[in-house]
């Protein structure tokens, strides 16, 4: 972060603008809009400056800049076309510890003025830190088109209601739900857009009189395989509205960083072979949180209905009449294979794909003869500890020992590792990776040499992506 983003309260504060041309005019408008007491210093001024001065909106000081003009000033802007003058303004301001902006000169600037989207009291600032001002302008234009003009009226209404809401609703959860209803109320927004404040007030009163349900709910959300960019839009909306987020080990830190900041977070991580929190206890946590009236998100890696025990958790909630819904996620098989350049199906290689759990606790549960059939791709979840058994059973039931395999560790993340080889090497390969890892078996693995797009990109933000290939000696 090259610049610390901050909004300054400049009402009735003395500011100095050095320069009297058209560029200085634009800066003066911003300072006047902010309520600053503006003094402008220049040898010549545009007619607009004289008009402002005649109206008593600012003061003009004609002549060369001298450091004494900085006395009692909160900040200064240099907007002349003379480099020596701008440099003197900056040096003088810096010596007196006054923030100074020199237009189009990042090296002589202690604060920058971003592109602004003004929906007062909502203010949005966009800055590239002086690196790409045109890009900042384009972003501002996109945001201008997205944000309705009545947004400021809605914010002003919310500000006027804050004390009343605080008195009306004792619990913080109730207040937040009221605000969410008010700020997403379509008819209220339309009334404000039409400047129909009578109708808007009626909608507000209806919201105050309507009972806020204290019945909680649970939303089962798939977080995807790791890359936060693979989280669905609906999943993002849910984690940003949650009162409580119950999450496990497979949810990446990048996804957790998107959770609403004041939401309670409950970690129930579990690993193959042992559970940090027993499944029965997880069920009880979800039940108790929902029964207390909270909006609960059960956040699971990948897709919650594919080896995620999501169905078991919802069965428990259904038995108690707790409302629930499901937001599917990109499952690990899809994400890891795509980021490894391995298509799960291909006309020349596989006409079907099977998703298989690799840590079934009872022998004989898997139909190894069918799994060893040709023209299909196998994806084993949680299979590292059983890699030797998988290798032995597939070869024993007729799958060629030379069948291609790949193990994907931390798939789709910047720490992704892919180890590949032949089925006869699977047990050995499994010792080179750690959990979470996915095992892909099938001739489609051979395509990764052509389609391996992710690790072949040498981005600075992906330094950990590595590839390993084992060869039969």
From Swiss-Prot:
Gene Ontology process terms (BP):
cobalamin biosynthetic process; methylation; siroheme biosynthetic process
- InterPro entries, A to Z: 4pyrrol_Mease, 4pyrrol_Methylase_sf, 4pyrrole_Mease_sub1, 4pyrrole_Mease_sub2, CobA/CysG_C, NAD(P)-bd_dom_sf, Siro_Cobalamin_biosynth, Sirohaem_synt_dimer_dom_sf
The protein here is known as: Siroheme synthase 2
Q: Which family does it belong to?
A: In the N-terminal section; belongs to the precorrin-2 dehydrogenase / sirohydrochlorin ferrochelatase family.
Q: Where is this region: Uroporphyrinogen-III C-methyltransferase?
A: 216-473
Organism per entry: Yersinia pseudotuberculosis serotype O:1b (strain IP 31758)
Alphabetized UniProt keyword annotations: Cobalamin biosynthesis, Lyase, Methyltransferase, Multifunctional enzyme, NAD, Oxidoreductase, Phosphoprotein, Porphyrin biosynthesis, S-adenosyl-L-methionine, Transferase
Residue ranges spanning the membrane: these are none
SUPFAM superfamilies membership = NAD(P)-binding Rossmann-fold domains (SSF51735), Siroheme synthase middle domains-like (SSF75615), Tetrapyrrole methylase (SSF53790)
Q: Where in this protein does the record put region Precorrin-2 dehydrogenase /sirohydrochlorin ferrochelatase?
A: 1-204
Active site feature? 248 (proton acceptor), 270 (proton donor)
Q: What does this protein do?
A: Then it catalyzes the NAD-dependent ring dehydrogenation of precorrin-2 to yield sirohydrochlorin. Finally, it catalyzes the ferrochelation of sirohydrochlorin to yield siroheme.
Q: In which pathway does it act?
A: Cofactor biosynthesis; adenosylcobalamin biosynthesis; precorrin-2 from uroporphyrinogen III: step 1/1; Cofactor biosynthesis; adenosylcobalamin biosynthesis; sirohydrochlorin from precorrin-2: step 1/1; Porphyrin-containing compound metabolism; siroheme biosynthesis; precorrin-2 from uroporphyrinogen III: step 1/1; Porphyrin-containing compound metabolism; siroheme biosynthesis; siroheme from sirohydrochlorin: step 1/1
Q: Which residues carry this modification: Phosphoserine?
A: 128
What superkingdom does the record give? Bacteria
- Is Iron-sulfur one of the keywords? no
Q: HAMAP family given for it? A: Siroheme_synth
Annotated S-adenosyl-L-methionine binding sites = 225, 301-303, 306, 331-332, 382, 411
Q: Which gene encodes it?
A: cysG2
Q: Which reaction(s) are listed as its catalytic activity?
A: uroporphyrinogen III + 2 S-adenosyl-L-methionine = precorrin-2 + 2 S-adenosyl-L-homocysteine + H(+); precorrin-2 + NAD(+) = sirohydrochlorin + NADH + 2 H(+); siroheme + 2 H(+) = sirohydrochlorin + Fe(2+)
The residues that the entry says bind NAD(+) are: 22-23, 43-44
Q: Where is the organism placed in the taxonomic lineage, from the top?
A: Bacteria, Pseudomonadati, Pseudomonadota, Gammaproteobacteria, Enterobacterales
